[in-house]
UniProtKB/Swiss-Prot annotation:
It holds the Pfam family Rimk_N. It comes from Shewanella oneidensis (strain ATCC 700550 / JCM 31522 / CIP 106686 / LMG 19005 / NCIMB 14063 / MR-1). The keyword Manganese applies. The keyword ATP-binding applies. Belongs to the RimK family. ATP binds at K141, E178, Y179, D187, R211, S212, N213. It comes from the Bacteria. This is Probable alpha-L-glutamate ligase 2. Mg(2+) 2 binds at E260, N262. Mn(2+) 1 binds at D248, E260.
Length: 299
């Protein structure tokens, strides 16, 4: 098959591993920077171009679209979809998962466990917002933040009020969540592929830090999931409409709680912690599902 990988970083671990895994299985792979693409949209034959040339036909596209380019990256991916190319994660699922508030609302409607979450627009609502999530300590999150950036633990009510007021003053969209103390600065990343969790790791925050993101200095280790955790992770990914997702769970006194569903989960941490060939599993999934939709293009 001919496979396109939408990525700004051909040198990144995840991109290189996907190229390696696809090549080993006999596929032709091209890494495409979505920001270099431009599109011809018409009723006869839509197309995608780079540098004055039209892209050749592809059988499948694997999106590795960073949060900062969600709008344009999703538009390019949507163009591939319009042209009949199988997308591992489609543009709707990616856009849905990137909206943290919408994600929470959708999962809440499906009865998926979540930290109590509050959202408000007016500073006058701050006291009620804090009470709504159980008071301090609490977590304040920028809706546009990634990799632990824009996440603040407010340990006192006064600190919470000050931080929320500051964010609101900057016209930043935030949400407020209860702090799950019993998680002890750890979360679980479940790597969902289709209807299975193919790998999972526990991420532990550095001493004195509550964010467990590996980009923030957290450490990763192998973890054994409970059947409930496995089920919750798969349901969360399906709620977003994603075939591939990194679902982040907290272990609480009242069961697993979903923190976030990531539509472009990194491979380095999960493969390093589990020694599993996650990239190979992704390519195998693409093979099975792309071939169901159309005849493969000859590489």
């Amino acid at each position: 098959m001919r496979i396109a990988i939408l990525s700004q970083g051909p040198e990144l671990y995840s991109t290189k591993r996907l190229v390696e895994a696809a090549t080993l299985r006999g596929h032709e792979v091209k890494v495409i920077n979505p920001l270099e693409c431009y599109m011809n949209i018409n009723m006869r034959q839509s197309s995608i171009h780079i540098g004055g040339e039209e892209l050749p036909p592809f059988d499948a596209v694997i999106p590795r679209i960073g949060a900062s380019i969600t709008f344009y990256g999703s538009a390019v991916l949507r163009q591939f979809e319009m042209m009949g190319v199988y997308a591992l994660n489609d543009s709707v699922g990616i856009s849905r998962s990137r909206d943290k508030l919408r994600s929470m609302q959708l999962m809440s409607r499906r009865g998926i466990g979540l930290p109590i979450t509050g959202f408000a627009n007016k500073p006058s609502d701050i006291p009620d917002l804090i009470d709504m999530v159980g008071g301090a300590p609490l977590v304040i999150k920028l809706l546009e933040g990634t990799q632990g950036i824009g996440v603040v633990l407010a340990e006192t009510r006064k600190a919470a009020e000050s931080v929320i007021e500051a964010f609101m003053g900057l016209k930043a969209n935030i949400m407020v969540q209860e702090y799950i103390k019993e998680a002890n600065g750890a979360d679980i990343r479940c790597f969902v592929l289709g209807d299975k969790v193919v790998a999972a790791m526990k991420r532990q925050a550095m001493p004195g830090e509550f964010r467990s993101n590996l980009h923030r200095g957290g450490t990763a280790s192998l973890v054994k999931l409970t059947p409930e955790e496995r089920s919750v992770a798969i349901r969360a990914a399906k709620t977003m409409g994603l075939n591939v997702a990194g679902v982040d769970l907290l272990r609480s006194n009242h069961g697993p709680l979903v923190m976030e569903v990531n539509s472009s989960p990194g491979l380095e941490g999960i493969e390093g912690a589990t020694a599993k060939d996650v990239a190979g599993a992704i390519i195998e999934f693409v093979e099975k599902n792309a071939l169901k939709t159309k005849k493969p293009t000859q590489a």
